Regions:
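A general structural motif
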Residues: 12-14, 100, 134
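Structural recognition of alpha->loop->beta junctions
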Residues: 123-137
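Short, basic/glycine-rich phosphate-binding loops at helix/coil junctions
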Residues: 58-76, 101-104
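Active-site neighborhood of HAD-like aspartate-dependent phosphohydrolases
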Residues: 2-66
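Substrate-recognition element of Asp-dependent hydrolases with the DxDx(T/V) motif
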Residues: 80-84, 89-123
Length: 137
């Protein structure tokens, strides 16, 4: 890689964008909200938009293990196939790709064991549904 005009570029001249999914192009909190609300016994609109990074602290999970249980159930129910798209995200990524940027999806979605095949296939389905170009996941 070399630097040209402040942009790191691989030898072949294409810029590489490491693109996270949740909270960047997909609304993870919006997608998890109905699952968490059901678990808490509240209406989904009763859960505020998280104003801190840790959703475990933003919503009334008893602890991290509680969050993991809700998250696991949501993933098994298809969370990653149905997350809301952040407005304008798909268009922006398509524009970057058209300009020659190599889009590489980087994500921490694989943090719970036993769900890897589901997480990867649902992530790919979501990216394709929204026509978000990428070269690797």
């Amino acid at each position: 890689m070399n630097e040209q005009n402040g942009v790191l570029r691989p030898i072949n001249g294409r810029a590489v964008l490491g693109l996270d999914v949740d909270g960047v192009i997909a609304d993870y909190a919006g997608g998890l909200r109905p699952y968490a609300a059901s678990d808490f016994g509240v209406i989904a609109d009763g859960l505020p938009e998280p104003d801190i990074y840790s959703i475990v602290d933003a919503w009334p999970f008893s602890d991290y293990a509680h969050y993991r249980r809700v998250h696991r159930a949501a993933v098994e129910a298809g969370l990653y196939r149905s997350l809301p798209l952040i407005p304008g995200a798909a268009e922006a990524i398509r524009e970057l790709s058209t300009a020659g940027v190599h889009v590489r999806i980087v994500t921490h979605r694989l943090f719970i064991g036993g769900q890897h095949a589901r997480v990867v296939s649902d992530t790919v389905a979501w990216l394709e549904k929204h026509r978000i170009p990428y070269m690797s996941l």
